[in-house]
Structure formats: C-alpha cells, structure tokens
C-alpha cells in the first residue's frame, strides 16, 4: 500500500499510539514494521491473532513482560565464540523466565476454561521450547551484577582468600590510624583506596614518619595517600588474587556462553514468539482504548461500518456514523456544507480499512463487514485560497492522474472535493468524467463535493448513491451526521430567514430559481424527513433487539442455573447410592469373612439357609434400577437340570441341580447351593467343572485389579490384603497389583511374605518400571 496514502490517513499516528503500549524493544520493532496486508488469508489471520489476545486481555490479568529485551545479538555473538557478560546473561535469563511465566499462565487458563479455544495462541505456546536447564544454569551462577561466590569451587576459594587478606590489611591499617601517636599526623583517621590499593591519608609534613609508597595526593598537596610498607605485600597478594579471580570468572562466563550457544535456535524461537506476544498485547491494549471490535472479512466486495468514528478524534465528542456501500453500490458521493464532516468521513473510512488490514480492531459497533483491498488511493487536502487556486487545482489533478494510472477493481479510491479549484462548470464536468472512468475500472469510490450538478449524477447511473452531512438550520451549524442515500441540499433560504433577512426578499428569490431546482430541493427535504423517520425506527429496533438479547441472556443464565441444580440433585442421589454401596460392601466383607472361617473349619457344612439370609441382607442395600446390573440375557433352549448356566446377577458359572417350578431353580456354584430365579440364568455350553473347595461366588461390587496399601499400618495392611485377595478370587481375577510404595521396604517385605503363605496365590513378582517398579508387587492367583 502506498506510503503517501498512509501519511494522508495519519496511520503513523495510530502506530505511535500502539507503540506506546509495548513493553520491549522486540514489540516496538514489530509495531514499526506494521503495515496493512493485502492477502486475504493473511489479513484474516492477523485479525484472528489480535482478537484472541484481546479476548484474553479483556478477561484476565496477563503476566508481566517487564524486562523482556532483544537478545539475538548476544546469542549470535555467543555462537561465534564471543563471551557474554553477566548483564547479557541476565537478559537471556529474563527472556526464558517471561516465556515460562506466560506458558504457565496459558496452561492454567486452558485448564480453567476448557470450553474456550485459542488455536493461534495455542500454536505459539507449542512453539516455545523448554529452556529450564539453561535458566537454572544462569540463575544458580550469577545475580544481577556478578557471579556468585559459589559459582565454582575455585572462585569461592579465591574470594575467600581475598576477603581474609583484606581483613588483615584493614586490621593493620586500623591500628595505624587509631594509634594515639599518629592522630595529629593524619588528615583523617580513615582507611581509603587509591589505584586499587589500601592507603591512609597522611599530612604532607609528616611524610618522613611513614614508610611506604605514595599513590596519590590531594588537590592542595596538603595530604598524601600512602600505602604503608607493612601492607604492601598483602596488597600485592590481593592484586594477584584479583587476577586469578578474573581468569576464573572468564572461564565460568565462557562456560555459560557455551550453554547459550548450544540453545541458540531455541532461544531465537523464544525471542520471536515473545516479541510477537508483546506486539499483540500492545494491539489489544490500544484496541480497548478505542473500544475496537473485530470485523468480518468477506471475499466479495463489501463495506459496512456501523457507528464508525475516527480513532484520532475525541471519542466523547466525535459523532459516530454508519458508513455503508449497499448491495450493487460502487460509488458514494457526499455533499453538504463545508466543515460539515465530509473530509473526516473519507479519512475515517480509509483509516479503518488500513487499520483492519494491519490486524487492528476497528472503532465501530459489532457486526462490521469489510473486503480486503489491494490498495487505498487518496486525494485529500484542505482547500486553499483563491490566489492559490491554480496551484491547488494542479496539485489535486497531478495526484488524480497518478491514482488513475494504478487503480483497479481491487482498489478503494477516496476523492475530497473532486474537481475543486477551477471554474465550477468545468470542475463539475471533470468530476463526473473522472467518476465515470473510475467506475469503469471497477474501483470502489467515495467522493465529496459541493457541486450541485453531482447531486443528479447518481440518478442516471447505476451503482451510484448520494449521501450528505446534515446541517441544523436552527443552530446554523453542521451536526456531522452522515445521511446515506440522501443528497445534500441548499439551506440558503432557511439560513437567511433565521438571520433576519426580509421575507419579501426571500420569497422573491424563490421565484427566481427554476422549477426543477425547487422540486429537487423539496424532494431532498422529503428524503431527509423520511431518512430521519427510518433512522428513528432503526434505533428503536436496535433497542428492542438489545432487550431481546438481554432476555435471552437472562433465560440462558436461568437455564444454566437449572442445569446446575439438576446436576447437584443427581450428585446428591449418587452420594446416597454410594453410601448404600459402602454399606453393602461392608456386608459383603462380613459374608466373605464368615465363608473363610467356614472353609477353614474342616468338615464344617455350609448351611444353605444361612447363605441365603446373608445374600438377602446384601440385596437389601441395592437400588433395583441404579445399582443392579441391567443385563439382557441371551435366548437359548429351555433350561433343564444338568445344564451349565451363568448366573447374571453374580457373573458366575453354575450347574442346575433341580428345576423347582416355572420360575425358580436350584443352582450349584462351587460349594454354594442356591435357589435362584430362572430369568437370572443364562444357558451355557456344557463344560467339565473342576472340583474345588474354594468359594467362587462373586461379589456384586466390582473391585479394581489393584490394591493401594500406601499409608496403612502394617497390621491393617495385611488385614486389608486378605480381604482384597478373597474378593479378587471371587471376581475370577488371574493377576492383581499390590501397591505398597518404596519407603523403608518394611511393608513390601511383609506383603510378599504374606503372599508366600496365602492359599489363593500361586506366584508373585516385583513390578516392572512401567507398572510402578519396586513400589508394586504383582500377584498371580490360582
């Protein structure tokens, strides 16, 4: 897009306002590079990108980007063998820190609001590399100003020696300056430093009383700064240690620089992404300041800007206008009084197009629609005086000639006071001819004029619409309201009457104008009245729509509250059911405990009625519809004695011993014999049943294939393990996982010793790494 157009539309001022919202030189650099795109996909992507960040910015407190800075020069220097200093390393550390903070913020945002998606920002977050190691390497080695003493063992030793030597020097010099005999010989009883050597200030006349080296003197020459000979060697030692310190610091910084070079590509990606985020957040901040909205871009040519206003004007006083190229309209001609807002309307349209194609939200109400223009051409400038009319006309015409050379069907052309600066009749003729030419090219055009001839232009050409800026004859001032579809009319008679001109003169003047012109003015006046009526109705419609939207929002909230209430009722019901299940589980444990005791008593008979009574006690705890399995049994031939069946309610196999009646049968499940409903039985193919003394009844309560004993006391853990193994056997599990944790190993040892002795366990082993490692024991059941 032409720079001249951007200058005329004052796009640089918009960029300056966006630049003020950036935090870093990275963001500022991107603002300075910001230009309107002309590719449709690029324009749409840039707008979506800004809108995503704006949505987040308007709802949440973003993490600070303070301290973010451009570090690519340091990274490249590190890559070619240079050594970075502490300050440069800290800027790189801050870049990583800002990245990590933003990534953490985004992850929390996504977790908290799973229903909202930010695909573009999500992609940027996925681009960010992991640089945790480099961050810690820098962070643990240096602070803001220098390397830590413990940055290396060698550095710590050197600095310790420097500190102890300095302390000895200070003690020696303190004795000298505090000596009563030396008080009158010293300019001041202090120890100071000259040329990196510890010295004392001695009066010049007492120089001979102090053996040592003079390093400096005062401006008056009255004071000499002497390094006493007693500390010369210690100061020399400090100098040597400082040299060693510098070498060690250089070594450490070289090592850290090597780490930076190794992560060069990752750091450059981080810099690019974080700079882009700073740029986008600056766009979002600026957009909020103008209450910007996201336009919808369309492939077909369209312009609809509801209640648009110029973003550089005071929003509290500027009049917002709806600018629209209605269907099949390619040219809009605005007429009306000077200083009525015609030029501002042109600039508003042009600047909003440029902003939108630069990825900035635009100052309109929601629902704006735009197409993407390859170029915007402007001939906009203030009128000059009559003495300058020739230069004015020549300047405009030179610009128009240049526009006509390049404009095409993908262009928006803005003409301000087209044909002005020359003879009115010739100017009007030129204006109409230029408009015809641009329409033939296929460009979208908005032009302002004060030529009355152009009012009739739209009535004999298709695709042309008149518009005007309103003038209030009562206040004798423009209202700055744009009236689409209504041409401007002369207000000379009304203004003259308002100013007190005689009615006789006004009426005589009216007789002097042509009938056609009089009829046109009356028609325009009628159009203005109709436009105001329609506008009033539209505002009322907007009000009703907003009320309807509010009602819809209220109903949606109430519906959501109802759903939440319904959910809470369901959760409450589930909780009650779980309490019953818990009671049933305890009852089942008691039954299993009884069965185990019966099984361990040699020769003890299991009384059927006792088992049936216990089963009934368990059944009483279950809700028929919500807890029992709703199993559709398969259809087979009629069940008879001797058939092998599956008991649906227990999930166990059994053999039919006797058909009691049409509804009940006696079934043997292992050592248990029970009377069951026939509808609870599913006929299976005959299989040879292995003789066993184990109880194979399955608890209806489904158990997991793993038991977590972490946190249990030793004795309680073994009791829990016993009960679990019994339930696992009844559930026909072949293998189970006992989680005991690593800890001291006492619980692991106790569990494995117990498994060795347990009758239901055939084998066990330690867990594989994928299964939990040493914290898990895997038991195989018989």
Curated annotation (Swiss-Prot):
State what protein this is by name.
Endonuclease MutS2
Family statement = Belongs to the DNA mismatch repair MutS family. MutS2 subfamily.
Q: Does the keyword Coiled coil apply?
A: no
Role noted for this protein: Endonuclease that is involved in the suppression of homologous recombination and thus may have a key role in the control of bacterial genetic diversity. Acts as a ribosome collision sensor, splitting the ribosome into its 2 subunits. Detects stalled/collided 70S ribosomes which it binds and splits by an ATP-hydrolysis driven conformational change. Acts upstream of the ribosome quality control system (RQC), a ribosome-associated complex that mediates the extraction of incompletely synthesized nascent chains from stalled ribosomes and their subsequent degradation. Probably generates substrates for RQC.
Species lineage: Bacteria, Bacillati, Bacillota, Bacilli, Bacillales
Q: How does it assemble?
A: Homodimer. Binds to stalled ribosomes, contacting rRNA.
Record keyword RNA-binding present: yes
Q: Which residues form the signal peptide?
A: none
Q: Which GO terms describe its biological process?
A: mismatch repair; negative regulation of DNA recombination; rescue of stalled ribosome
What positions does the domain Smr occupy? 707-782
GO MF annotation terms? ATP binding; ATP hydrolysis activity; ATP-dependent DNA damage sensor activity; endonuclease activity; mismatched DNA binding; ribosomal large subunit binding; rRNA binding
Q: Which UniProt keywords apply?
A: ATP-binding, DNA-binding, Endonuclease, Hydrolase, Nuclease, Nucleotide-binding, RNA-binding, rRNA-binding
- SMART domains given in the database record: MUTSac, MUTSd, SMR
Could you tell me the EC number(s) of this protein? 3.1.-.-, 3.6.4.-
Annotated residues that bind ATP are located at 336-343
Q: Which Pfam families match?
A: MSSS, MutS_V, Smr
What is the uppermost EC class here? Answer: hydrolase
């Amino acid at each position: 897009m032409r720079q001249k157009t951007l200058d005329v539309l004052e796009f640089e001022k918009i960029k300056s306002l966006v630049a003020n919202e950036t935090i870093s030189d990275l963001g500022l650099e991107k603002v300075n590079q910001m230009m309107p795109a002309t590719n449709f996909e690029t324009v749409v992507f840039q707008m979506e990108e800004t809108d995503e960040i704006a949505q987040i910015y308007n709802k949440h407190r973003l993490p600070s980007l303070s301290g973010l800075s451009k570090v690519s020069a340091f990274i490249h220097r590190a890559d070619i063998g240079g050594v970075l200093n502490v300050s440069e390393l800290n800027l790189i550390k801050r870049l990583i820190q800002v990245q990590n903070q933003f990534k953490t913020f985004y992850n929390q945002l996504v977790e908290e609001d799973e229903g909202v998606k930010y695909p573009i920002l999500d992609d940027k977050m996925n681009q960010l590399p992991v640089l945790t190691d480099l961050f810690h390497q820098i962070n643990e080695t240096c602070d803001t100003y220098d390397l830590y003493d413990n940055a290396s063992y060698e550095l710590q030793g050197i600095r310790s020696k420097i500190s102890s030597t300095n302390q000895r020097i200070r003690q020696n010099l303190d004795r000298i300056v505090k000596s009563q005999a030396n008080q009158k010989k010293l300019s001041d009883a202090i120890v100071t430093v000259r040329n990196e050597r510890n010295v004392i200030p001695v009066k010049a006349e007492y120089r001979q009383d102090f053996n040592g080296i003079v390093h400096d003197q005062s401006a008056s020459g009255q004071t000499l700064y002497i390094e006493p000979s007693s500390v010369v060697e210690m100061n020399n030692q400090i100098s040597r240690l400082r040299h060693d310190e510098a070498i060690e610091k250089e070594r450490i910084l070289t090592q850290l620089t090597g780490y930076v070079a190794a992560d060069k590509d990752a750091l450059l990606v981080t810099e690019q992404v974080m700079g882009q985020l700073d740029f986008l957040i600056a766009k979002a901040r600026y957009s909020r300041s103008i209450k910007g909205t996201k336009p919808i871009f369309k492939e077909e040519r369209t312009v609809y800007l509801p209640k648009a206003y110029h973003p550089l004007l005071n929003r509290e006083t500027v009049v917002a206008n709806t600018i629209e190229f209605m269907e099949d309209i390619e040219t809009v001609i605005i007429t009306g009084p000077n200083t009525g807002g015609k030029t501002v309307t042109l600039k508003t349209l042009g600047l909003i197009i440029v902003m939108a194609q630069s990825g900035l939200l635009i100052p309109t109400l929601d629902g704006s629609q735009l197409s993407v223009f390859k170029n915007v051409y402007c001939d906009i400038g203030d009128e000059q005086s009559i003495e300058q009319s020739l230069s004015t006309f020549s300047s405009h015409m030179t610009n128009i000639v240049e526009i006509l050379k390049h404009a095409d069907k993908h262009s928006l052309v803005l003409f301000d006071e087209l044909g002005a600066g020359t003879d009115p009749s010739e100017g009007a003729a030129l204006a109409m001819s230029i408009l015809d030419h641009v329409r033939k090219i296929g460009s979208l055009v908005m032009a302002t004029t004060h030529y009355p001839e152009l009012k009739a232009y739209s009535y004999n050409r298709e695709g042309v619409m008149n518009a005007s800026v309103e003038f209030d004859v009562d206040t004798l001032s423009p209202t700055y309201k744009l009236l689409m579809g209504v041409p401007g009319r002369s207000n000379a008679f009304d203004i003259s009457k308002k100013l007190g001109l005689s009615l006789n003169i006004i009426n005589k003047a009216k007789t002097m104008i042509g009938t056609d012109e009089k009829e046109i003015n009356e028609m325009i006046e009628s159009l203005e009245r109709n436009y105001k009526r329609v506008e009033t109705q539209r505002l009322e419609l907007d009000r009703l729509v907003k009320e309807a939207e509010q009602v819809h929002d209220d109903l949606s909230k109430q519906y959501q509250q109802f759903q939440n209430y319904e959910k809470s009722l369901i959760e409450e019901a589930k909780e009650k059911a779980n309490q019953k299940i818990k009671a049933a589980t305890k009852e089942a444990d008691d039954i299993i405990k009884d069965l185990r005791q019966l099984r361990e008593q040699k020769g003890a008979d299991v009384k059927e009625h006792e088992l049936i009574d216990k089963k009934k006690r368990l059944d009483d705890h279950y809700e028929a519809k919500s807890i029992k399995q709703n199993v559709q049994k398969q259809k087979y031939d009629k069940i008879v004695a001797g058939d092998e069946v599956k008991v649906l309610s227990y999930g166990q196999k059994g053999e039919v011993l006797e058909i009691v009646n049409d509804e009940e049968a006696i079934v043997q499940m292992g050592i248990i014999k029970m009377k069951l409903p026939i509808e609870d039985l599913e006929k299976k193919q005959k299989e040879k049943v292995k003789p066993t003394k184990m109880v194979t009844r399955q608890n209806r309560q489904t158990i997991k294939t793993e038991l977590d004993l972490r946190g249990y006391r030793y004795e309680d853990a073994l009791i829990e393990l016993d009960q679990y193994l019994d339930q696992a056997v009844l559930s026909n599990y072949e293998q189970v996982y006992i989680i005991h944790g690593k800890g001291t190993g006492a619980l692991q040892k106790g569990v494995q010793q117990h498994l060795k002795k347990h009758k239901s366990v055939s084998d066990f082993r330690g867990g594989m790494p994928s299964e939990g490692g040493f914290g898990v024991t895997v038991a195989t059941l018989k």
